[in-house]
Amino acid sequence: MVDRIDPLDITNIKDLSTWMKTKNWRNIAKLEPCRFKESGRGMRTRKGLKAGQLLVQIPRLLLMTAGDFRTSKEWSWIVDKNLSCHDALVLYLLVEKNKRDSSFFHAYIKTLPEVFSMPTDLRSEMTHMLPNFIAMKLQDKIKSLQDSFKNVARGYKSICIKELGFSDFKWAYYVVNTRAVHITGSSGKFNADSSDCMALAPFLDLLNHTHDTSSISGFNPYTNCYEIETLSKTPKCSEVFINYGPHDNLSLFVEYGFMIPRNPNNFVPFEMTDFISACNEYNVKLSNLCLQTINLHNLMKNLGCFADGPSWSVKVLLKVLSCDWSSLMRIEDIIYRDFENHGLTEKTLLNCILEKKKEELQNSLSTIAKDKNCQIANCIVSFLEECLSIIEFSYAN
């Protein structure tokens, strides 16, 4: 369903298109802005698109890159060479925004959202309501945000001769985090191992992501443009999507502030402590040999449930936890050949873990669902409901 888009948005996007056309950009896929009920602001096409067609082609001149900032005559002498690519791009955006109308990228900056609703801005009391696996991931992100602020603030003060406010920093950080593209595999102008592997691309970031479309993207050294090619058909007057890659909803929620219903990549992670707790509850003894085997074979990675059930790592770990000493001596057979035959102990431990995870999710869900004043609360509720359905499916099967 298409809703009416804000007139100011339309004006700003028209101004952006006009400016980009003066720099040899063309709207090759006949895209136009719309507001969609399901995905918010996005782009639809005025013509049907076939697989293999280019969606966007952004000239190199219009890309904002950390490398351009570092090597500019204006700022190269003052930019800290130790800044990460991400932080340098955040600083570049803040410096350009501070220039206002005189910025080369002024038309682009006007199209960027003025505010972001992100989980890192949740009140502390709501963060405490979240399941542990979400809260831990969120805490890591908040720490990363704070570290980035310290790095960027020093450079901003040197360049703009004023202090950087945390709210202004967060705006730029979220712009880069949610909109920057990674540019690799080109003719050497961009290098994933260098300080110039990310870019902000005007117009491109108006396209929304979905898991059920296919697209390829990258910098084309022959056209000197960043290009996205669709591998899916799009009917006339329909929203045009791109695919960021296979992200689970936890990553999408923490990094970008949204989730995708029925995401096939969705994953509810488990911690090793979940397994130890279940073993303690059912008096399953963990010998030193068992723990050494788990560490030796790196069996604590990728623990959790997908939409179709527990991960391979969970099945193997449960088998190892249920083994006696003699069985552990033939561990290779257990890990690579025999793990599909589940014993009673394995099923008991798994059900214990699933029951506790289900209870944790239900408690969080019932509490957060009562908060009607937080914009991102609805996203959290949807995310928790998806996680709960995954756990319930695994429990039933």
Curated annotation (Swiss-Prot):
Gene Ontology molecular function: histone H3K79 trimethyltransferase activity; histone H4K20 monomethyltransferase activity; histone H4K20 trimethyltransferase activity; histone H4K20me methyltransferase activity
Listed Pfam families: SET
PROSITE patterns the record matches: SET
Catalytic reaction equation(s): L-lysyl(79)-[histone H3] + 3 S-adenosyl-L-methionine = N(6),N(6),N(6)-trimethyl-L-lysyl(79)-[histone H3] + 3 S-adenosyl-L-homocysteine + 3 H(+); L-lysyl(20)-[histone H4] + S-adenosyl-L-methionine = N(6)-methyl-L-lysyl(20)-[histone H4] + S-adenosyl-L-homocysteine + H(+); N(6)-methyl-L-lysyl(20)-[histone H4] + S-adenosyl-L-methionine = N(6),N(6)-dimethyl-L-lysyl(20)-[histone H4] + S-adenosyl-L-homocysteine + H(+); N(6),N(6)-dimethyl-L-lysyl(20)-[histone H4] + S-adenosyl-L-methionine = N(6),N(6),N(6)-trimethyl-L-lysyl(20)-[histone H4] + S-adenosyl-L-homocysteine + H(+)
Similarity field: Belongs to the class V-like SAM-binding methyltransferase superfamily. SETD4 family.
Function: Protein-lysine N-methyltransferase involved in the regulation of cell quiescence by catalyzing the trimethylation of 'Lys-20' of histone H4 and 'Lys-79' of histone H3 (H4K20me3 and H3K79me3, respectively) during diapause formation, a state of obligate dormancy.
Protein's name according to its UniProt entry: SET domain-containing protein 4
